[in-house]
Amino acid sequence: MFAVVRMRGTVDVHRKIKETLKMLRLHKRYHCVVIPDTPSYRGMLQVVKDYVAYGEINAETLALLLRLRGRLTGNRKLTDEYVKEKTGYETIEEFAKAVVEGKASLKDLPDLKPVFRLHPPRKGIKNIKWHYPRGNLGYHGEEINRLLYKMR
């Protein structure tokens, strides 16, 4: 599973990149989506690598995102009771672990919005003009979890 965060804005974006960001549902800066690791998504990430930060998300970070930034239709917060009622998993943490392992999908929660609207990174970011490790763009690997924690 990859977490993808849009780091740059909307001005002067090439049409192909803009359309790919739209397909990924990354319409605004600091929006995040969680996508599976498939060849088609990897190709999309290759197109938008100069506008996003992405990497492999772990279960703890996904649980944190779901608990703090997970929203249902009507802008209701995601709760343990809702997860238990709809999926059978007891807590958000168990559900996040199952999603990362591939046993469940985020689509198993029927009203969950696919985009997490994150806070700008606390303590700032390195640079949005350079790639990782000098800046914040491109592939981060496991370090994306640190960035997502700063943006919780």
Curated annotation (Swiss-Prot):
Domain of life from the UniProt record: Archaea
GO biological process per UniProt: maturation of LSU-rRNA from tricistronic rRNA transcript (SSU-rRNA, 5.8S rRNA, LSU-rRNA); translation
Record keyword Ribosomal protein present: yes
Keywords: Ribonucleoprotein, Ribosomal protein
Gene3D superfamilies for this protein: 1.10.15.30, Ribosomal protein L30, ferredoxin-like fold domain
PROSITE patterns xrefs: RIBOSOMAL_L30 (PS00634)
A single GO molecular function term of this UniProt record: structural constituent of ribosome
GO cellular component: cytosolic large ribosomal subunit
Pfam families (alphabetical): Ribosomal_L30
Entries under InterPro entries matching the protein: Ribo_uL30_ferredoxin-like_sf, Ribosomal_uL30, Ribosomal_uL30_arc, Ribosomal_uL30_CS, Ribosomal_uL30_euk_arc, Ribosomal_uL30_ferredoxin-like
Presence of the UniProt keyword Transmembrane helix in the record: no
PANTHER family linked to this entry: 60S RIBOSOMAL PROTEIN L7, LARGE RIBOSOMAL SUBUNIT PROTEIN UL30
Assembly information from the UniProt record: Part of the 50S ribosomal subunit.
Alphabetical list of HAMAP family matching this protein: Ribosomal_uL30_A
Similarity comment text for this entry: Belongs to the universal ribosomal protein uL30 family.
Protein name: Large ribosomal subunit protein uL30
Origin species: Archaeoglobus fulgidus (strain ATCC 49558 / DSM 4304 / JCM 9628 / NBRC 100126 / VC-16)
Gene: rpl30
